Design a protein with these regions (language model features):
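Bacterial N-terminal signal peptides that target proteins for export
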Residues: 4-17
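Bacterial N-terminal signal peptides
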Residues: 15-27
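Sec/Tat signal peptide C-region and signal peptidase I cleavage site
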Residues: 27-33
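Short hydrophobic alpha-helices and adjacent helix-cap/hinge residues
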Residues: 34-36, 60-63, 196, 203-207
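Early exported N-terminus immediately downstream of N-terminal targeting peptides
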Residues: 38-118
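Surface-exposed, charged secondary-structure patches
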Residues: 120-159, 211-224
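Short beta-strand edge/turn micro-motifs at domain boundaries
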Residues: 160-186
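Low-complexity, intrinsically disordered terminal/linker segments enriched in charged
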Residues: 179-224
Length: 224
């Protein structure tokens, strides 16, 4: 069934990967849980719609739009997002085959660095708005994974958007967003693979710590 949500977000991904907190790996709060009151699991689509609706409430809050409330607004957005994105899964997929070669300690360090990279990439775009509708077209599920199909209805063109989610303990969490064929995870993986090939994994970590990694996240990435 097609569902439409009116919204004022230029790019959903600007918000979905804005949070810079590894606490995104913790359990969701009751208001964001993807189970119904009787304990029955809801769909991945409902999880995405719930997240968008919560974000819209914050973005449309006139009090939080005041300049002196900028930090509070950002905090409230982060509180929503950190319960809805699986940063570990995202980092694992972005690093690709190199992930399995790392120790648990190095994996944790990489997740920390990756989340900070996401935050640096998207932090400046949080105020980008335009009146759009999100039309949910359906979802595909295979075991613990789901692909929620949607369209952003623009004034001139419609843009296909896929939300990719993984189920963790009866909760659906986003680990990638594909906008008009451009996957955020794939673009990071392409860049990371190139840096590792040229410099080694240690070189990649060094560049991430120096904030010297720049990825055009909404462009279709070439094969690594």
């Amino acid at each position: 069934m097609t569902t439409i949500i009116n919204m004022k977000i230029k790019s959903l991904a600007h918000l979905l990967f804005f949070s810079g907190m590894v606490a995104g790996l913790t359990m969701a709060s009751p208001s964001l849980a993807t189970t119904t009151p009787n304990g029955i699991e809801s769909s991945a689509t409902e999880a995405v719609k719930g997240t968008i609706n919560d974000l819209i409430q914050v973005l449309d809050d006139e009090t939080l739009k005041q300049p002196e409330q900028a930090e509070e607004r950002r905090h409230e957005i982060e509180e929503i997002i950190k319960h809805r994105v699986d940063y570990e899964e995202m980092a694992k997929r972005a690093l690709g085959a190199h992930w399995s070669t790392l120790s648990p300690r190095d994996q944790h360090e990489f997740v920390d660095l990756f989340v900070q990279l996401l935050r640096d990439t998207f932090v400046g775009r949080i105020t980008e708005h335009s009146d759009e509708q999100v039309v949910f077209l359906g979802e595909l599920r295979e075991e613990a994974f789901a692909d929620v199909k949607a369209q952003m209805k623009g004034r001139k063109i419609d843009t296909p958007v896929d939300f990719r989610l993984i189920r963790r303990a009866h909760e659906w969490r986003v680990y990638d967003v594909v906008i008009d064929g451009a996957s955020i995870v794939s673009n990071y993986r392409s860049q990371f693979t190139s840096i590792i090939r040229d410099l080694s994994y240690v070189g990649l970590v060094k560049k991430m710590k120096q904030k010297a990694v720049a990825v055009k996240v909404f462009e279709k990435s070439p094969a690594p």
